[in-house]
Curated annotation (Swiss-Prot):
Protein name: Cytochrome c-552
This protein's UniProt keywords: Calcium, Electron transport, Heme, Iron, Metal-binding, Oxidoreductase, Periplasm, Signal, Transport
Upper classification of the organism: Bacteria, Pseudomonadati, Pseudomonadota, Gammaproteobacteria, Alteromonadales
Gene Ontology cellular component terms for the protein in this record: outer membrane-bounded periplasmic space
Gene designation per UniProt: nrfA
Localization annotation: Periplasm
Length: 467
């Protein structure tokens, strides 16, 4: 049920909004968040960036693979997970996903402010205005009226200049941690580092002094094993699994880390080389195409600059690698789904925390490795061998968990196989978890109808004060 807003709370909301408006009038001199400001000065780049809006299709990844609903039980990704679209949709899609809930005010909702961090040049603007302490404080809804410009110019470039930059302080700290400071990097390296501001694994800190801050788990290295050791060393978990009660890790989108492990990364072929090639405009000018997308769509400007093989041949090789990765992915999922249900059965049979601890550690490590491999959307092209290696270790660790579970269940008198319910569709899997999807969708639609227009109106008024 919706809470009625009292006069006191309404006044407080108005005060918060007014303070945001005042802050907007003092926008940072380092970041211009409005992409359209550059549409004349950098016409070709702007128009090609705007073309990312042509990736209109929304692909429901949970519908394609309902196993993931069970693997993310108790976490927002079990509600909604769609394949990524172009940069133009960054703000739209994070607003619309069921994962962000249906907040009714700036202090409501399931997710923190940090969930805006990869979505907009308004993020560096806010960090510059408020500091990281101010930006990261509070709920995701707090940023609704502030973060309205999609991923664009100010995320990767100095204000009004083609010069590349890191616009988020936590990224500079991460690059320093692995001994590759941006300030000392070559232009070629910088072309990938700017992408690493978002296309990476990250987590939200839980320490009192930096609660909610974004951090990359690179202190011990960027391989799946080293990040795993780091997370274990600080006893971090993203959530507790609803079935197995395992302390879980949710991988994000570690394209930078997996790219470094593949043939392109090891030969320093940058993200820009393949995804933002140099092209020629209608008036004969060379420019960097900002329609970030599949290299095969611009084969002559991307792959063909290095490869002598035909497009058809390389597409075939890539599809073959995708099929192998998918096959191993599904094997890992099959083992993990069974492990979660078997762990649930063990708890119900009276298993103790001491008995379950090594089992839950195996489940945690197995799913972390599965997730890191599949969350990197281009891994079959970037690092197929590494993906298969990681998924192989995931299968092994899930099998280790299941062997221990079989022994434990036997001690508890359960010798028959633990039944896995029908999870053949997204809806059936969500029903198994007791998720009221109808209510979640209705709440989201009300949010989109009642709250989003207010956010946009506040943003419009704030930006009208910009010079």
């Amino acid at each position: 049920m919706m809470k009625k807003m009292t006069g006191k709370s309404f006044a407080l909301s108005a005060l918060v909004a007014a303070s945001f408006m005042a802050a907007g009038a003092m926008a940072s001199d380092k970041t211009e968040p409005r992409n359209e400001v550059y549409k004349d000065k950098f016409k070709n780049q702007y128009n090609s960036w705007h073309d990312t809006a042509k990736s209109e299709e929304l692909v429901d990844a949970l519908e394609q693979d309902p196993n993931m609903v069970i693997l993310w039980a108790g976490y927002p990704f079990a509600k909604d997970y769609k394949a990524p679209r172009g940069h133009m949709y960054a703000v739209t899609d994070v607003r619309n996903t069921l994962r962000t809930g249906a907040p009714k005010d700036a202090e409501d909702g399931p997710l923190p402010m940090a969930c805006w961090s990869c979505k907009s040049p308004d993020v560096p603007r806010l960090i510059e205005e408020q500091g990281e302490d101010g930006y990261f404080k509070g709920k995701w809804a707090k940023g609704g009226p502030e973060v309205t410009n999609a991923i664009g110019c100010g995320d990767c470039h100095d204000k009004g200049s083609p010069k590349l930059r890191i616009s988020r302080p936590y990224v500079d700290r991460a690059l320093d941690a692995i001994g590759t400071p941006f300030s000392k990097a070559s232009k070629q390296d910088k072309e990938s580092m700017v992408c690493a501001q978002c296309h990476v694994e990250y987590y939200f800190e839980k320490t009192e002094d930096k609660k909610g801050f974004v951090k990359f788990p690179w202190d011990m290295g960027v391989t799946v094993e080293k990040m795993e050791v780091y997370y274990d060393s600080i006893q971090f978990s993203d959530w507790t699994h609803a079935l197995s009660k395992a302390p879980m890790l949710k991988a994000q989108h570690p394209e930078y880390e997996t790219w470094k492990m593949g043939i392109h990364g090891m030969n320093n072929v940058s993200c820009v080389d393949c995804h933002m090639p140099k092209v020629t405009s209608a008036d004969g000018k060379k420019f960097t195409d900002h329609k970030v997308g599949n290299p095969f769509d611009r084969f002559e400007e991307t792959c063909a600059t290095c490869h002598s093989q035909t497009k058809e041949f390389l597409v075939g090789v890539t599809n073959e690698r995708k099929a192998k990765v998918k096959e191993m992915k599904l094997k890992a999922e099959e083992q993990l789904v069974k492990a979660h249900f078997e762990a649930e059965a063990a708890w119900k049979a009276g298993a103790t925390e001491e008995e379950m601890k090594p089992i839950l550690t195996d489940i945690r490590h197995s799913q972390w490795r599965w997730d890191l491999a599949i969350a990197s959307h281009g891994v079959a092209a970037h690092a197929p061998d590494e993906a298969l290696r990681i998924l192989g270790t995931s299968v092994n660790k899930a099998a280790d968990a299941r062997v221990k579970l079989a022994q434990l269940l036997g001690k508890k008198g359960i010798t028959d196989p633990v039944a896995v319910p029908d999870i053949s569709t997204k809806a059936k899997a969500q029903a198994v978890l007791g998720m009221d999807m109808k209510q979640l969708v209705e709440e989201k639609e009300a949010f989109k109808k009642n709250i989003l227009p207010k956010w946009d109106e506040e943003a419009k008024k704030r930006e009208a004060t910009y010079k």
